[in-house]
Amino acid sequence: QNFITLAQKGFYKNLTFHRVIKDFMIQGGDPSGNGTGGPGYSFEDELNPATESYKQGYVKGVVAMANAGPNTNGSQFFIMLKDTHLPPSYTIFGKVISGQNVVDTIGNIKTNASDKPSESVIIKEVTVSSK
């Protein structure tokens, strides 16, 4: 619900994908643009191993909350570039249903040693739909 509310309020508009790790994931949603920012609050993890998304795991196209440890979710999220085994510590809340080619293109952008893209990758719009 947090992501949906922020998206509907336009929170993500003009933010960047500040972290790109080839063949792993892209991360965005930080208003400071460096991985330290958020909406001004945090919320608890919503981890439910019984759900289908957790049974499938962190597969290509999955969208999950980025965090700095348990119960530190805010506005930052990541999108998986390929199927990857991760501990179930990140709240999965969606999957890319359109535009995975754009995600893949971002995943191949040149980055510096800190995984920051050499050129800004700006989020123009976030659209949430239910399937």
Protein language model features and the residues they cover:
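Cyclophilin-like peptidyl-prolyl cis-trans isomerases
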Residues: 1-131
